[in-house]
Every structure is written in C-alpha cells, then in structure tokens.
C-alpha cells in the first residue's frame, strides 16, 4: 500500500493528477440536462466501437479487387467470431448515423448552435460530413456488386460540377474508370484519413464544449 502511495505521490508531484481528476469529476451539470443531451456521447461510443472492430478486420481484409470479396467471406465464415465483429461494425455504423442525426436535431432545437457556440456547431457539421464519407467509403470495401456500383455512381457525381468536375472524378477513382486504384483510395480514406480527421475534430469539439459548458434551456 505504501509503494502504491509513493508511486501516486511521484506522479502527483510532476503532473498534478489530483487537479486533473477534480476538474473532470466536479464539472457542474445544469439541472435542465436530460437523456437527450447524451446523444453526442452515444455517438462517440459508436465511433470507438467502429474503431475497435474496424481495426480487428484489417488483420484479414485484403484491399484488392481480386481478393476483397473473398477476404470478407473468409472473415464471416472461417474466422472465430469474425461474423460477430463485422456485424457489430455494421450495426454500430448504423447506430452512429442515427445518433448523430438525433444529436444534430437536439442541438438545433435547443439553440445550442447560437453565440458563443458557433464554432462548436461548425465542427459538428464537419464531423457529420466525415461520417457520411465513412459510410460511402466503407460500403465499397467488400467489392461485391452493390459496393462496386455504389462506388461507380458516387464517384461519378462530381462530373456535374463545371470546370473541375472531371478532375475530381479522376481524383476519386485514381483513373478514368473504377478499379484497383479506386478501391485502394477508398480503403485508405476509410481506415486512415477519415478516422484521424474525425478524431481531430472530435477533440476540438469536446475542448470547446468543456470550455463553454452545456448550452442553457430555451
């Protein structure tokens, strides 16, 4: 017991752990806060589940047009609890989108976007866009008929934009047509670019909430 106390004292002297703990655990919660104010936190939990299950699947998934579908089939049928990992990933993705939509509605209806919380709202909107991008890129990774044609349609949408439309289509596809380069880019976006982008904006979002507190009632 004395050893654990001395270890704690060592860290306390250098990092002031107790002050951090007191700040986290003693934050004032306004009396008007109810269960609907937990929707943002539930969205965060869904993201963490997505991260954990997605990381687990990267050990088996092969991002090539010839092996992607078979690797997903192998995960679902031969890997122990692979079906459960992928199913939880898919279910938590749907839950994350639903909780995000409800969270946006709650913030809007309670006026949480108003001054001085405009930047908190902006970071939230950016995270909503990133979440949609997660869905689009993840949908394609099994590289089945549904995934292939979804990518072909989605990546072709920017073609309607004047001047830069064709360039954006080629940037998304990695060439003139949908193929290996497209799958590689979508896989990179889904497993690296988007998660880190979302994590950065989440940190900004939470720090601003921490600084400004929860918005008051209507």
UniProtKB/Swiss-Prot annotation:
Q: Does the keyword Membrane apply?
A: yes
Q: Which organism is it from?
A: Prochlorococcus marinus (strain MIT 9312)
- Family stated for the protein in its record: Belongs to the cytochrome b family. PetB subfamily.
Q: Where in the cell is it found?
A: Cellular thylakoid membrane
Q: Which domain of life is it from?
A: Bacteria
Misc remark for this entry? Heme 1 (or BH or b566) is high-potential and absorbs at about 566 nm, and heme 2 (or BL or b562) is low-potential and absorbs at about 562 nm.
Q: Where would you say this protein principally sits, based on its record?
A: membrane
Name of the protein described by the UniProt record: Cytochrome b6
Task: Please spell out the taxonomic lineage of the organism that makes this protein.
Answer: Bacteria, Bacillati, Cyanobacteriota, Cyanophyceae, Synechococcales
* Recorded GO MF terms: electron transporter, transferring electrons within cytochrome b6/f complex of photosystem II activity; metal ion binding; oxidoreductase activity
Q: How does it sit in the membrane?
A: Multi-pass membrane protein
Q: Which GO terms describe its biological process?
A: photosynthesis; respiratory electron transport chain
Q: Which UniProt keywords apply?
A: Electron transport, Heme, Iron, Membrane, Metal-binding, Photosynthesis, Thylakoid, Transmembrane, Transmembrane helix, Transport
Annotated heme b 2 binding lies at: 89, 190
Amino-acid positions noted as binding heme b 1 in the UniProt annotation, renumbered to this chain: 103, 205
Q: Which GO terms describe its cellular component?
A: plasma membrane-derived thylakoid membrane
Q: Copy out the cofactor comment.
A: Binds 2 heme b groups non-covalently with two histidine residues as axial ligands. Binds one heme group covalently by a single cysteine link with no axial amino acid ligand. This heme was named heme ci.
Quaternary structure and partners:
The 4 large subunits of the cytochrome b6-f complex are cytochrome b6, subunit IV (17 kDa polypeptide, PetD), cytochrome f and the Rieske protein, while the 4 small subunits are PetG, PetL, PetM and PetN. The complex functions as a dimer.
Stored InterPro entries: Cyt_b/b6_N, Cyt_B6_PetB, Cytb/b6-like_sf, Cytochrome_b_N_euk/bac, Di-haem_cyt_TM
Question: Does Heme show up as a keyword for this record?
Answer: yes
Looking up NCBIfam families in the UniProt record yields:
PRK03735.1
Q: Which residues cross the membrane?
A: 35-55, 93-113, 119-139, 189-209
Needed cofactors, names only, are:
heme b; heme c
Positions annotated to bind heme c: 38
| Biological role | Component of the cytochrome b6-f complex, which mediates electron transfer between photosystem II (PSII) and photosystem I (PSI), cyclic electron flow around PSI, and state transitions.
